[in-house]
Each structure stands twice: as C-alpha cells, then as structure tokens.
C-alpha cells in the first residue's frame, strides 16, 4: 500500500513538472485532481503515521519541484535540430495520467510554433474526438528569425497498452514576446469537405452590372423652372392692367363729354316765329293772361282789345264775324 502511494506521488510530481510551464492555475488544478485521486484510492485502507509523514514530505517536495521547474534555465531552441527534446517515462499510462484523458495537441501561448501528427489508431480507447482532420506536411519548415528564444521545453511520451504512442510538447513563454515570422506549412493534399456544407457556394465573385436605359423626357414638365411662374404672373398682370386702364379711360372721356354738352344746354329754348301776327289764334292763346270764354255765342279766342268798352258794338260784331264779301264767285267748268 505504501509503495502504491509512493508511485502515485512520484507520478504526480512528474506530471507537475510537465504542467509547470502552463501557469499557476493549471498547476493548482492538476495537483488538486491528483491528490483527490490519491485520497480516493486510500479511503478504504488504513495508513500509518509514517505514511502520512511521507505524504506531507512528498507534498513539500512537489511545491519545491514546481518552484524549480518555474525557474529552470531556458533552452536554446534554434540550436536543436527540431526544437524538441524527448523525455520518456517508464511509468504506465494508468499510473501517470490517472483518469485524465490525453489530448493530441496542446498549445499554450500565441507565439508557440507546433506541428503534431497523432499516431493513435481510431479504435484505441484513448483516441480523442477533437483530433485535427488535416495534418501538416512532413516537409513543413518553420521560418524563424535569428533571434535566440528563451523558452523552456518539456516533452513526454506516453505509451498505451495498444502500442500507440502520444507525444506531448509544452513550451513555456517568457513575459517578453520576441518577433517571430509565421510558420510556412505546405498542405499534403486538397481538403476533403462535405458537399452539403458547400451547397450554394460559388468560388468566384459574381458581378452584376446594371445597364441604364436611356429615356428622354421633357425636363420642363418634370422639373419646371422657378422663373416661369413669375413671368406668367407678370404677363397676366400686364394684360389685366391694360384692360382695366382702357375701361377707365373710356368712362372718363364719356363723363367729360357729357359735362361739356350739359353746359351748352343750360340756356332755355323756345320756338319763335320770324314774324308776329296777332290775329293768329296761336299767338292769342300763348299771350292770354286770363281764361277765355268758351261759350257757343262767342266762340272766338280771347282778345283783350275786343272786350274794350270804348269800342262800339258794331265794330265788335264786325270783328267777331267772318267776312263773307271777299269770297270770289265760283267758276263753272265749260
């Protein structure tokens, strides 16, 4: 039982060395998981005080080893042929990894340059479903600058019962980020894609050119000039003013002519004969100041001289009668 506990502690120590470059958070998670596994295996069996002391000492060794791993001297990556050193451990996968599931590729920081080909068969129990479907070309050469990179590298090769090996590469990055040229990878073949994912996809860019149709329209109707309504208003105003002025002028001239003609007609107009004959009955009628006698006996027009008392009656009767002596005799026809 004590030997099993030592083996587990050694495996946790080795695993902590591997995961020391990932950061403080990954170290705490891994150590707590491994310690939890140790406690699960040792739940049902009593452990002596010596084994507990050994566990405490092993925990102290784990913390010191983590500090040493974090302060380990950096490796010069360009001096190596492939930039990766392999460390093999003889411990089995059951004791070294526990219930953890191995991954095919572990990448930590953005400046990490890593290419990995998984050799695990598909029907192996530890085959991961997250394996990359495309593998890099074996002749892929990373183009690196001549700068010396201060990165620490830890590799581990785990052997499984199915004779399949998994290589895990871990690079710890320094706080300073050196300039690195991008990796040049030559693909070994065309990408295999499903036909369903590219339905309706066209490899070329379609360009649609619109050909405008020329349509000539009268711009005066669509966009009338703003000065045209003003001109039309001016023309209509001029015509209306001319008509109104003509009417007023004619009426004014008519009024002036009427006034001039009225002044000329102010004098009284009377019909006068060129000679005055008092024996005419019309003149007697016009000059009669009093009403005349209309009796049958005296049917002549009124004459004031006839009513004079100084005149004899014979003369009055003679004037009143019609003289018949001057009538010539009628001539008989032969």
UniProtKB/Swiss-Prot annotation:
Expression (tissue specificity): Expressed in spleen, thymus, prostate, testis, ovary, small intestine, colon, peripheral blood leukocyte, bone marrow, lymph node and lung.
Residues the record marks as carrying a glycan: 30, 61, 79, 90, 148, 155, 163, 218, 225
Signal sequence range: 1-23
Cellular component GO terms held in the UniProt record: extracellular region; Golgi lumen; plasma membrane
Positions on the Extracellular side per record topology: 24-236
Matches recorded under Pfam families: Mucin15
Positions in the Cytoplasmic compartment: 258-334
Post-translational modification: Highly glycosylated (N- and O-linked carbohydrates).
Compositionally skewed regions (Polar residues) per UniProt: 77-94
Keywords assigned: Cell membrane, Glycoprotein, Membrane, Secreted, Signal, Transmembrane, Transmembrane helix
Region of interest (Disordered), residue spans: 64-104, 304-334
Transmembrane parts of this sequence: 237-257
Function, in words: May play a role in the cell adhesion to the extracellular matrix.
Annotated PANTHER family: MUCIN-15 (PTHR45427:SF1)
Protein's UniProt name: Mucin-15
Organism the protein comes from: Homo sapiens (Human)
